[in-house]
Amino acid sequence: KDDVLLTVDDLPAGSTVRLAVMDRFDGNVWNLSDSTMASDSSNYHRVGDSIANNAAGKRFTAKFTVDDGLSDYWLPMAGAASSVKFATSSDADSFYYNTDTMSAIYPSRTSPGLSYTETGVIPRTPTDKEIAKANASSISQPKAEDVPDCVDKLATAIAGGQSKGGEAAQALADKLRESGWFSHGLNGD
């Protein structure tokens, strides 16, 4: 618990760092879907000097330095990146970014001393009232497989009477959090 894996300078207070994105759960194991399952969540592309994104929020520029103990294919990031500059230019050749999930992969694997500067936006977190008023969006997700019938029945029982998609999502999140099945991984979850 006390090992330093990553040092980040100049990130706005309260910002989170995304270490990985797992969007597929088979009931036992979280995993990353491939491009045949969900086009939105598996679109990693090499990027040049800038990354197009439409995120609104607090702009930042932060320096990341990988310390001992972090050797992974995921490149830690914060918010929605608009550019990533590596201390060593050849390191940029192994950088891939997904604008839909605001996440990055680094096939050469991170290693101690890897240093990069991310410029981007920490998206504004909507209020509970704004979420409740929101309609559901349509996104491409992996097909849920082997889901017991009781899951659909429980979801309908919890959220079926809500008039907006946001209200339904909040009702589901609240009930699952109360039962210990849901967390954003943040303090207080």
Predicted regions and their residues:
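Beta-strand-rich, non-transmembrane domain signature
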Residues: K1-D93
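Acidic low-complexity segments
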Residues: T88-D189
